């Protein structure tokens, strides 16, 4: 079942190249607030579609339209994640302050971070299936019931699998691109060659890899939610 979800998500992310390009542009400029909000607003739309989908179906990524609603959805998406992550983030920062590491506080922060990520990952599809209600994203007891119906062990393994697959793909592509950039620097041994090579590397990572992995992850979120 879980492997089928991964397979579906990989295929889904590659069915509409034009969307990858649009998301790539937004990803490239995501240091700016507005492009980032639209980026996450579209990802929310993918989650919502996926909660209504069958595994190994033939859905394609949704249209990039209704920008006003997409922007609002993006704000909700970001707000939900920030709210879930703010407490563990503060604890982790405090554990690293004063020039030393408080190991106990750091461990507590990392455990809370994992728990927050597990809940926030289901909070988005739960919100999408409850009338886009922001309040529903914080119905922790209800989200916990969904998690329990999926199976705690299966859900945690699925989530960690998504992270592992995403990180592995990113690292492999990063290493391959680094090798290509090194060859480019040897062929064009100037400061301009180094700049061009690094720029092309960032271009591939932000225009192709980042949007592809974001579609993969959000598609998985909606499909895993459906198991519950």
Q: Which role fits each region the language model picked out?
A:
Residues 3-29, 64-90, 118-171, 218-219, ...:
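Interfacial aromatic "cap" segments that immediately flank transmembrane helices
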Residues 36-61, 65-97:
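Selected alpha-helical membrane-embedding segments in polytopic membrane proteins
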Residues 93-94, 165-166, 174-179:
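Juxtamembrane/interface motifs at transmembrane-helix termini
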Residues 28-54, 100-137, 171-181, 190-228:
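Selective recognition of hydrophobic, aromatic-rich stretches within alpha-helical transmembrane segments
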Residues 1, 7-8, 55-58:
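Low-complexity, intrinsically disordered extramembrane tails and loops of integral membrane proteins
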Residues 58-73, 98, 102, 106, ...:
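Membrane-helix interfacial "entry" motifs
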């Amino acid at each position: 079942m879980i492997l089928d979800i991964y397979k579906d998500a990989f295929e889904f992310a590659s069915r509409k190249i034009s969307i990858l390009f649009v998301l790539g542009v937004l990803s490239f400029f995501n240091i700016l607030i507005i492009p980032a909000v639209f980026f996450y607003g579209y990802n929310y739309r993918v989650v919502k579609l996926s909660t209504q989908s069958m595994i190994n179906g033939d859905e394609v990524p949704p249209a990039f339209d209704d920008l006003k609603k997409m922007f609002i959805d993006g704000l909700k998406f970001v707000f939900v994640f920030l709210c879930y992550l703010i407490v563990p983030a503060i604890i982790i920062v405090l554990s690293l302050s004063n020039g030393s590491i408080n190991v106990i506080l750091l461990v507590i922060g990392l455990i809370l971070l994992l728990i927050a990520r597990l809940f926030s990952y289901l909070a988005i599809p739960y919100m999408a299936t409850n009338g886009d209600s922001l309040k529903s994203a914080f119905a922790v007891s209800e989200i916990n019931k969904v998690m329990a119906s999926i199976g705690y062990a299966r859900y945690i393994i699925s989530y960690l699998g998504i992270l592992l697959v995403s990180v592995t793909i990113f690292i492999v592509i990063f290493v391959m691109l680094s090798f290509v950039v090194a060859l480019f620097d040897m062929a064009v041994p100037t400061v301009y060659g180094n700049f061009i090579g690094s720029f092309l590397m960032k271009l591939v990572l932000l225009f192709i890899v980042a949007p592809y992995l974001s579609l993969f992850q959000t598609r998985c979120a909606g499909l895993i939610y459906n198991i519950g």
